[in-house]
C-alpha cells in the first residue's frame, strides 16, 4: 500500500 510492497 504505502512503503513496503502493498
From Swiss-Prot:
GO biological process, one term: neuropeptide signaling pathway
Keywords: Amidation, Neuropeptide, Secreted
Distribution of this protein across tissues and organs: Limited to neuronal cell bodies, neuronal processes and sinus gland.
Modified residues (Phenylalanine amide): 6
Location of the protein in the cell: Secreted
GO annotation, cellular component aspect: extracellular region
Purpose of the protein: May act as a neurotransmitter, neuromodulator or neurohormone.
Annotated family: Belongs to the NPY family.
Name of this protein: Peptide tyrosine phenylalanine 1
Organism: Penaeus monodon
Amino acid at each position: 500500500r504505502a512503503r513496503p510492497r502493498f
